[in-house]
Amino acid sequence: MNSSLRDIANLVQGMVIGNDAITVSTLSPIDNILPGSLVFAEGEDNIKLAENSEAAAILIGQGTIDSPKPLIQVKNPFKAFIALLNHFYPPRRISPGVHPTAVIGAEVQLGDEVYVGPFVVIESGSIIGNHSVLKSHIHIGHNVVIGDHTTIHPQVTIYDNCRIGSNVTIHASTVIGSDGFGYTFVDGQHLKVPHSGYVVIENNVEIGANTAIDKATLGATVIGEGTKIDNLVQIAHSVKLGKHNIICAFTGIAGSTTTGNNVIFAANVGVSDHVHIEDEVILGARTGVPPHKHLKKGTVYLGNPAKPKDVAIKHELSVNRIPLIRKNIKSLTEQVAVINKKLDIKAKEVE
C-alpha cells in the first residue's frame, strides 16, 4: 500500500515538513530501517539514526527541528504510529461461515456474519454475536453468551454459562470458567468446594495466551471493561476486577480479591485472597500482597510483603546496609574487648 506523506498526515492529523508528495509503502522499526520506509523516532539519538538511514521520512513529536529528511509532526507520535500500523497492516478479513467440521449444539444462536472455524464445538443454548470470529479447535460450553465483534483464537475453552462481551479478544489456549482452586481439609483429606458460578468478561477486554480465569464459587468472577491481561496470568474464583486494569505476565490473583479502576499489576505480582485494591494503584514487579489487605487509592506498592513505595525503598536501603552495620558492630566489639582488657590490667595494678 503506497501512501503519500500528505495522505498520511491527514490520517494522523499531523503536519508535513518537507516534500509532502513523497510516497511510502511500509513502516520500519528504528533498529531495522528499510529503504523508502516511514520510521517513528523519538529522542535525539533515534532521530539522528533515522536521518542517517535510507528512510523516506520520519514520524516525530511536536517541536522545532531541522532535518534533511521529510518529517511528519504529530501531537502524540505513538498514537499516530498505532493508526499507521492499522493502515499499512490491516488485519486479515475472515469470510463468515461455519466450517463443516464444526459441531453446533441444539438451540445455538449464531449472529450475522459469524465465522466458526474447523473443529469448533458450541454446546446447546449458546449465543454468538454478530461479526464474531471463532477460530479452530475452540470449545464453547452450554449457555455461553458471546457479544458482537469478538475474536476467540485457537484452543480456547469457555465453560458453561460464561458471559463474554463485545469487542473482546481471547488469545490461544486460554481457559475461561474452570473450577476455582477451593478445598478444605476435613477428616484427613482435602474436600473440594463446589463451584457453581460463572465468569463475566465485559466489553473491550483483551486476554493473552495461556491464561486461566476461574468461575466463582457462587455468582460471577468479573473482568471489568477495557481491562488488558497478559499471557500466563491466573485469576482465581470470585475475583472482581474494575475497568481498564493492566495485568502483566506471571501475575496471580487469589480468590475474592476486588480491584477498582485503572489498577496496574506489573510482572509476577502475587495477590492473596480477599484483598481490596482501590483505583489507580500500581503494584511493582514481584510485589506480594498478604491476605485481607486494603491498598489505598493512587499508591505505588513494592516488595513482599507489599509496602508503599517510599516505605519499601527505605526498607530496602536499610537491608542493604546490614552488612556494613554488622562489620561496624564487629569492629566496635573488638575495640570494647581491647579497652576492657586494658581496664582489667589497670585494676590489677591498683590492687
Curated annotation (Swiss-Prot):
| Pathway, per record | Bacterial outer membrane biogenesis; LPS lipid A biosynthesis
One of the GO biological process terms: lipid A biosynthetic process
Lineage at the top is: Bacteria, Pseudomonadati, Pseudomonadota, Gammaproteobacteria, Legionellales
- Name the chain's protein: UDP-3-O-acylglucosamine N-acyltransferase 1
Q: Which family does it belong to?
A: Belongs to the transferase hexapeptide repeat family. LpxD subfamily.
Q: Which CDD domains match?
A: LbH_LpxD
Q: Pfam families recorded for this chain?
A: Hexapep, LpxD
**Which keywords fit this entry according to its UniProt record?**
Acyltransferase, Lipid A biosynthesis, Lipid biosynthesis, Lipid metabolism, Repeat, Transferase
Where is the catalytic site? 237
HAMAP family, sorted: LpxD (MF_00523)
Q: Mention one GO molecular function.
A: N-acyltransferase activity
Assembly and interaction partners? Homotrimer.
Superkingdom in the source lineage:
Bacteria
According to its UniProt record, this protein's enzyme class is transferase
Q: Which PANTHER family match?
A: UDP-3-O-ACYLGLUCOSAMINE N-ACYLTRANSFERASE, UDP-3-O-ACYLGLUCOSAMINE N-ACYLTRANSFERASE 1, MITOCHONDRIAL-RELATED
Q: Name one GO cellular component term.
A: membrane
The EC number(s) given in the record are 2.3.1.191
The UniProt function text for this chain reads: Catalyzes the N-acylation of UDP-3-O-acylglucosamine using 3-hydroxyacyl-ACP as the acyl donor. Is involved in the biosynthesis of lipid A, a phosphorylated glycolipid that anchors the lipopolysaccharide to the outer membrane of the cell.
Q: Which reaction does it catalyse?
A: a UDP-3-O-[(3R)-3-hydroxyacyl]-alpha-D-glucosamine + a (3R)-hydroxyacyl-[ACP] = a UDP-2-N,3-O-bis[(3R)-3-hydroxyacyl]-alpha-D-glucosamine + holo-[ACP] + H(+)
